[in-house]
Design a protein with these regions (language model features):
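Short strand-loop junctions, especially beta-strand C-caps/beta-turns
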Residues: 156, 212, 236-238, 409-413, ...
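General small-molecule cofactor/ligand-binding pocket signal
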Residues: 152, 207-209, 436
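FAD-binding core of FAD-dependent oxidoreductases
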Residues: 91-100, 159-162, 193, 299-304, ...
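A short, small-residue-rich loop immediately preceding and capping a beta-strand
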Residues: 149-155, 184-187
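Conserved PLP-enzyme active-site core in the AAT-like
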Residues: 130-133, 160-331, 338, 418-419, ...
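Non-catalytic terminal extensions of PLP-dependent enzymes
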Residues: 1-149, 167, 174-177, 276, ...
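Glycine- and other small-residue-rich loops at beta-strand/loop junctions that grip anionic moieties
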Residues: 96, 154, 188, 236-244, ...
């Protein structure tokens, strides 16, 4: 169907390059950089760099690195970038639950500075006072934002922060001699799936609460679930459907009365910054995704940071080291009585920490609150407009307003036309909108999750809405066009079955060759 006059939709087609993997571009003898020999005064001082390495650990053959000239490397990655979509290219609001906001480029420049890039975690503390100050002051900022008493910046993702919460919870009960009997973790179906998954990795039996007719976690079900076996509660609020539970303090009270610990998954905190805090809801632990909420980029599996906060009582269990300040200098503090130890090497993903620190400083307290308000405003504007599109609904209509996102349903459209949510999102890719299907678990039928954040203008939201309207009209008039989409992307369809088959996984070049041989490596998209 042609784009209608007056529509904000753009004619879009991705570039397609029959581009090899970088290893396939290798030509013996080519080089991108000539590494000079170390000067004599340096080699005399530090040696040859190899003699201290045990012979059993030394290579017997040269590493199989690609030999490619600089110009060809530049072309390679520019071509790949043209085959991609990202937050700097499109209205990236369809990636619900992921808070794809604008990442200020000045913060990228700060993090790329040699002052940040050239320091090493093994340096003496006296030589990295600036970095330690950034980490210490970010801890202070997050204390104010959450109301909790101390933060560890060590976890390197939201899921790792949840696993760290589970480890702290286990150690807390271990100290009290109850770890063996308190083996149940309560969560909700619309909390982030990692809340259940990470706790299960730690060995907990998971009890999942379902919502009532208003979309709220059922408080009566919680009362029935708690027992002497309750280790704790991990819950996201607002949940992944965008509904804020106003009875959250009642939930924590019920779990505390049963002897459990309450952990707050604040992956969806973008709509409540400066408005409500973990402290007032009486949580013991919480974490923020710095790579989402606080302006550092989110995507491609990292880098990330799940800053983990604790009350004064549970701060005794945080990973070591935390950063301290004695009035004259910053230092790495290992004096944490019941620490669970380390959850990663060194002290955290420092570039992410630095970007988040700069983002908070640039906005200030009122700016954080304004960002949250605009995110909520954008979301509720979309809520009204999307639900006016025939075939789109918003489940749990008892909650008239949502916070930072909404999980919509295309069930009515599917029943009428046979076009499902995957078809809609694939067709949206033909107009330059990032395809994403993060709507798990599929409790809402034909789910579709949108999170606009504070970054997008009304005009950009209207452009996205025009895309949805166009695709829905096509679903009724040209369903095969939608079914066969995308038409303008680099890859038409990806066989997603391999994602669930470990035998097919090959996340490195070496693994690809080992599993499938060079014939498979030559296959082009």
């Amino acid at each position: 169907m042609e784009i209608q006059p007056g529509s904000r939709l753009r004619n879009f087609h991705q570039a397609k390059w029959d581009e090899e993997v970088i290893f396939e571009l290798s030509t013996p003898g080519q080089r991108g950089l000539h590494v000079p020999e170390a000067e004599t005064e340096i080699s005399d001082l530090v040696g040859d760099g190899l003699s201290r390495i045990p012979a059993s650990m030394r290579r017997t053959t040269a590493p199989a690195l690609p030999e490619v000239g600089q110009m060809r490397v530049l072309k390679h990655y520019l071509r790949l970038s043209q085959q991609n979509l990202g937050g700097d290219l499109n209205v990236d609001i369809g990636q619900g639950t992921c808070t794809m906001k604008y990442n200020p480029k000045i913060n990228e420049k700060i993090a790329a500075s040699s002052k940040a890039q050239d320091i090493h975690p093994h340096q003496d503390e006296s030589t990295v006072q600036g970095a330690l100050r950034v980490m210490y002051e970010l801890d202070l900022f997050l204390r104010e934002i959450s109301g909790l008493d101390r933060f560890s910046l060590q976890p390197s993702s939201g899921s790792q922060a949840i696993l760290t919460m589970a480890a702290i919870m286990h150690e807390y009960h271990e100290v009290r001699g109850q770890a063996d009997t308190r083996d149940e973790l309560i969560t909700t179906i619309f909390s982030h799936p990692s809340d259940a998954a990470a706790a299960a990795v730690k060995g907990y039996r998971i009890i999942t609460l379902y919502p009532d007719e208003q979309g709220m976690p059922d408080v009566e079900a919680l009362k029935a679930a708690v027992s002497e076996r309750t280790a704790g509660l991990f819950i996201t609020n607002p949940e992944d459907i965008g509904i804020f539970n106003p009875r959250i303090a009642e939930f924590t009270r019920i779990v505390h009365e049963a002897g459990g610990i309450c952990g707050y998954d604040q992956a969806n905190a973008n709509g409540i910054l400066g408005i409500t805090r973990a402290r007032e809801a009486d949580f013991d632990l919480c974490f923020f995704n710095l790579h989402k909420t606080f302006g550092a980029p989110h995507g491609c599996g990292g880098p990330a940071a799940g800053a983990l906060g604790a009350t004064r009582e549970l701060a005794e269990y945080l990973p070591v080291p935390v950063v301290g300040y004695d009035g004259s200098k910053y230092f790495l503090d290992y004096d944490v009585p019941h620490t669970i130890g380390k959850v990663r090497g060194f002290y955290g993903a420092f570039p992410v920490i630095l970007k988040s620190y700069a983002w908070i400083l640039s906005l200030g307290a009122e700016g954080l609150k304004e960002a949250a308000r605009v995110a909520v405003l954008n979301n509720n504007y979309l809520l009204k407009k999307v639900t006016e599109i025939p075939g789109a609904t918003s489940p749990y209509t008892g909650s008239k307003r949502r916070i930072e996102q909404v999980r919509y349903s295309w069930e009515e459209l599917y029943n009428e036309t046979g076009i499902d949510t995957h078809d809609v999102t694939r067709r949206m890719a033909d107009f330059g909108f990032h395809l994403w299907q993060s709507h798990h678990p599929f409790v809402v039928p034909q789910p579709f999750t949108i999170e606009p954040t504070e970054s997008y203008s009304k005009e950009e939201l209207d452009e996205y809405l025009d895309g949805l309207r166009h695709v829905v009209e096509e679903a009724r008039t040209e369903p095969e066009t939608v079914k066969r989409a995308p038409h303008n992307s680099v890859v038409h369809r990806i066989d997603e079955s391999s994602l669930d088959d470990p035998e097919k996984w090959a996340v490195t070049w070496r693994a690809l060759l080992k599993k499938h041989g060079r014939t498979a490596a030559k296959i082009r998209s």
